[in-house]
Each structure stands twice: as structure tokens, then as C-alpha cells.
Amino acid sequence: MTEQKIDKRVARTKTRLKEGLADLMTRKSIQEITVKELVEYVHINRSTFYLHYSDISNMLENVKRELIEEIAEVMESYPPEPFSEESVVFMKDVFFSLGSNRKLYRSLMGKNGDPSFVQQVEDLVGEKCLTGLKRQFPNEMNMLKYSYRFCLSGCVGLIRSWLQKDPEDSETPEEMADQSFRLIMSVIRETHPRIRR
């Protein structure tokens, strides 16, 4: 068997395991999910699971790391300027990334999810935005930091609500990006009249 075929099989197996884990996490906490339950759910041998992960916790850590790396990659491709026109494009790419792994994000950010993962996402996005704010408005930071924190928490809430909807019934990533940007800018303009972008 060629290496390419093996790689595709491995990718398919990992995708099935991830989707299965996401499904099970909508029903119960990660601590309650066993390897036996997961492999039976996705119809994979237990030995196949152990080729890739040592246990459920190890799998979850790998999944979280992959998702964080994907968001970080999106963020690195944009300059840290929160109120530029590129901000909307950046937000669209973030929402596309979230949408492409919707099941996993929904599970990780849902009621049986992982609060540390939510915090990692918030910290990653927040650091990028804060860097841009400091660069653009060095003399406004004392007050901007409160607006920034308010907007960041609001965006996380917006993302969570969006992820809980069925894809067919929810807004597109473009619509969510536009809505997020408008909400952020309305808060910033209201609280900081000198910022008129």
C-alpha cells in the first residue's frame, strides 16, 4: 500500500474519531467518555485508536492543539489593526475556520466542553487585538482596555450561540463577521468618540 493511501486512511480514521468524540461530548462530559464507548460509536477497533492516541484525554489535547494552531495560522496572516477594513476579512476567515470544524468547536465550547479551551481561544484572539489597539491608539489604552474586554467577551458569546445552531439554519461566516464587526465598532464609537473608523 502506498504512503499516500495510508495517510488518507489515517486522516479518515482520525476524522471519524474526532466527529465521534464531538457527538459524545454533546451528551456527556469528557470525563465520562471511555475509549471503548468511542470506538464502538464510530465502528473502529480499539487497537486502531491506540495507534493514534494513548487515551481520551490525550486525544482531546491533540484535537485542541490542532484547532488552536489553525486559528493561530489565520491570525498570523493579518496585520494587528483592529479597526482596519481587513478586520472584517480577518473575522470572516476566523468564522470560516470555526464553521469548518463546527462539531468540534460546538462540543468544546458547549455545556460539556472545556473551559480552558475557550480561554485559550479568547486569549489568542485577544492578544492579537490588544497588540493592534496598543499600536493604533497608545494614548487611549487606559479606557480602551475595558471596551476591548467587553467586545471580546461578547464575541465569544456570539460565537457560542452561532455554533449551537444547525448550519442550515444559521448565518453564514460572512454574515457573522459583518455583524461582529458592526457590534464592536458601535461599542468603540460610543465609548471613544475620537475613534471614527
Spans of features found by a protein language model:
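Alpha-helical bundle regulatory/interaction domains
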Residues: M1-E37, Y41-R197
